[in-house]
């Protein structure tokens, strides 16, 4: 257990130089109607993307934990996905794997722990309370059917508000890749738990 916490500390030392996103939500943002034809066409496109990969950089801040790392995300379905974190200052890696029987977290030193409850395992090992099952959709800019969301003037997802386990998450999609209209810089916040997740996606594969 201590080894995992030590690994998290290695990630933490690079937080100041990582993810140049502002921690504060943008203001005075203009939005357009959700019925916009270009947005609806894009929404249909990303809804068809069932499995995909994303690579980039991630920064996480909470009252008790903070770390920054490179990441590789591979998503197949809600019971099959992996998130690999790479330290920016060492060779340390952390692999989070979701499978049929639950979640397994392991590091490059051979330490490993599994549990049926993925949420509790993430909290115990990493100190992170982020709903990865929802992140799969948030990352590609696909709002849930019951989410309160806004469409930007670029005809892409601009922001959303979503309730998970009694707390409220907000997301702001700050920039998109020009070649495929997939998210580039995303700011996720949960004010009730004081968590901030800053994501920069450098590469999309789908």
Swiss-Prot record:
Top-level taxon of origin: Bacteria
Major localization class: membrane
N-palmitoyl cysteine lipid attachment residues: 19
UniProt-listed PROSITE patterns: PROKAR_LIPOPROTEIN
Subcellular location: Cell outer membrane
Pfam families: LolB
Keywords, alphabetical: Cell outer membrane, Chaperone, Lipoprotein, Membrane, Palmitate, Protein transport, Signal, Transport
GO cellular component, one term: cell outer membrane
GO terms for biological process, alphabetical: lipoprotein localization to outer membrane; protein transport
InterPro entries in UniProt: LolA/LolB/LppX, OM_lipoprot_LolB
Membrane topology: Lipid-anchor
Chain residues carrying a lipid of type S-diacylglycerol cysteine: 19
Coiled coil: none
Signal peptide range: 1-18
Function: Plays a critical role in the incorporation of lipoproteins in the outer membrane after they are released by the LolA protein.
Protein family according to the UniProt entry: Belongs to the LolB family.
HAMAP family (UniProt xref): LolB
Subunit details: Monomer.
Protein name per Swiss-Prot or TrEMBL: Outer-membrane lipoprotein LolB
Organism: Haemophilus influenzae (strain PittEE)
